[in-house]
Design a protein with these regions (language model features):
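Solvent-exposed, flexible loop/coil residues
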Residues: 50, 106, 112, 116, ...
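A generic local secondary-structure boundary/capping motif
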Residues: 50-51, 215-218
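N-terminal "assembly arms/tails" that initiate or stabilize quaternary assembly
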Residues: 1-95, 348-356, 360-367
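Long, contiguous amphipathic alpha-helices that act as assembly "spine/axial" helices in icosahedral shell
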Residues: 62, 89-171, 219-233, 331-340
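Residue-level detector of alpha-helix boundaries and kinks
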Residues: 47, 109-111, 321
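Generic structural motif
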Residues: 52, 65-71, 98-100, 105-107, ...
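Sequence/fold signature of self-assembling virion shell proteins
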Residues: 2-20, 30-35, 164-215, 225, ...
Length: 367
C-alpha cells in the first residue's frame, strides 16, 4: 500500500498538531498540573478565566466582594435604612499574542521526514511553552524577576501584555527572622517556624473595616489549606531544621489529609499546619540581601485562593494554540511556529495583593 504524504501546511495536520501541542503543554506545565482551576469560583491558587476564548477583546475584569461589617438589628428595632451597601474591588488582566518556532534546517542537512519534523517540533515547543509559562508565573507571583540565570526572559524583563509586575506590598511580605531585606543574615533560613510566623501574619490580616482584602485559604473536601512553594535550597534547609522525626511527621500529615487526592498535594513534600509544602527550581532568587548586600535569598510563595489570574484568547481556530508551517528560501527550509494569546497577573484589589504572601529567607546558592 502506498504511503500517504501529508504536505506542508495541510489543514488536518495543522489542526492535529495544534491540539497535541495544547495537551502536551498542559501536561508539562508545573502550575497547570497542580494549582490552576477554571472559572471565577475556582478553589485553587490560580483562576483560569475563559471569557475571551470565544469572544473578542483583550481585557477581562473581575471583582472581589468585601465582607459585610454592619452591626445586626436587634429585636424590634427598625431595619429599614440600615442595610449595608455591597462593596466591590476590581482587578483586570490583559491578553496578547506570544509566538515561538523552530527551523527544520535546509534540504541538504535535513535528514527527517516532514512528519518527524512535526513531532520533534511539537516536543521542543511544548517544553518551551510550559517552561515559559512556569517561569512567567513565578515572576509575576513573586513581583520580581530575580537573578535566576537560566530563565527564558532576561533579568531586565518587566512583563508583557500591559500587565505590570508589582512588588509585594508590606502586608504581603514576610522576611525570615522578622527582619527586612537589609538586615537579613545568613542564618535566617527556611524552617517550619518561619511557616508558622508567615501563617500568623496571613490569618491576622484583612477583613473588617480596614479595606484590606482577607487572604482566603483553598477549600478541599471541607478542609482549609494553603500552599507553600519553596526553592530547592529552602526545602533542604527546612528538612535539616526539622530533623528526621519532624520531617517524617510532615510527610505523614500529607499522606493522611482528607484532601490528599487534590492536585495541590501531587508531588508535594508534605504538610505542616495545613500548609501543603512544595519545591521548584524556578522559585525567584536574589543575591543582594543583608547589610552588605551580599546574602543570597529566595522568595517562596505562600498561596491562598485565587492568588493569580490566567486568561486565554482564541486565535480564531477554536483551539488554544495556533500551528503554522511554511517553506522559506525557495522551499529549501521548513519553518514550524506556534502562537498563543494569553495574559497573566497576580490578583490585586484596592492596591494590595490578595492571595499570596512572599516569604523571603536566606538561601545559599546550590553549586
Amino acid at each position: 500500500m502506498a504511503r500517504t504524504i501529508v504536505g506542508l501546511g495541510d489543514a488536518k495536520a495543522v489542526k492535529k498538531f495544534s491540539g497535541m501541542l495544547a495537551v502536551d503543554v498542559s501536561r508539562e506545565m508545573y502550575w497547570e498540573r497542580k494549582f490552576i482551576g477554571k472559572g471565577r469560583t475556582a478553589s485553587a491558587p490560580i483562576m483560569q478565566l475563559t471569557e475571551l476564548e470565544n469572544d473578542a477583546g483583550e481585557l477581562i475584569t473581575y471583582d472581589l466582594s468585601m465582607q459585610l461589617t454592619q452591626q445586626p438589628v436587634e429585636g424590634d428595632e427598625v431595619q429599614e435604612g440600615t442595610e449595608e451597601e455591597l462593596k466591590f474591588y476590581t482587578d483586570s488582566v490583559y491578553i496578547d499574542q506570544a509566538r515561538g518556532g523552530v527551523n527544520g534546517g535546509g534540504r541538504m542537512t535535513r535528514k527527517r521526514t516532514l512528519h518527524n519534523l512535526r513531532m520533534v517540533g511539537k516536543d521542543r515547543m511544548s517544553e518551551w511553552w510550559s517552561r515559559m509559562f512556569d517561569e512567567l508565573i513565578f515572576i509575576y507571583m513573586s513581583g520580581a524577576r530575580g537573578i535566576n540565570a537560566d530563565f527564558i526572559y532576561p533579568t531586565t524583563w518587566t512583563g508583557r501584555a500591559n500587565n505590570a509586575i508589582t512588588a509585594p506590598d508590606s502586608s504581603h511580605l514576610h522576611v525570615a527572622g522578622g527582619h527586612a531585606k537589609g538586615t537579613l543574615v545568613a542564618d535566617d533560613k527556611m524552617s517550619l517556624a518561619e511557616v508558622d510566623s508567615a501563617l500568623v501574619k496571613v490569618k491576622a490580616m484583612g477583613g473588617g473595616t480596614g479595606g484590606i482584602p482577607k487572604m482566603k485559604p483553598i477549600k478541599i473536601n471541607g478542609e482549609l489549606h494553603y500552599v507553600l512553594v519553596m526553592s530547592t535550597r529552602q526545602a533542604s534547609d527546612m528538612r535539616t531544621a526539622a530533623g528526621t522525626g519532624g520531617w517524617l511527621d510532615v510527610q505523614k500529615a500529607a499522606a493522611t489529609a482528607e484532601g490528599r487526592v487534590s492536585p495541590i498535594f501531587k508531588g508535594g513534600l508534605g504538610m505542616y499546619n495545613n500548609v501543603v509544602l512544595h519545591e521548584h527550581e524556578a522559585v525567584i532568587r536574589f543575591s543582594d540581601y543583608g547589610s552588605g548586600g551580599n546574602i543570597g535569598a529566595a522568595r517562596s510563595l505562600l498561596l491562598g485562593n485565587q492568588a493569580g489570574a490566567l486568561a486565554y484568547g482564541s486565535p480564531g481556530t477554536g483551539l488554544r494554540y495556533d500551528w503554522h508551517e511554511e517553506a522559506r528560501d525557495n522551499g529549501n527550509v521548513v519553518i514550524i511556529s506556534s502562537s498563543c494569546i494569553f495574559g497573566f497577573k497576580k490578583t490585586t484589589y484596592n492596591g494590595l495583593d490578595f492571595g499570596v504572601m512572599a516569604v523571603d529567607t536566606a538561601a545559599l546558592k546550590i553549586s
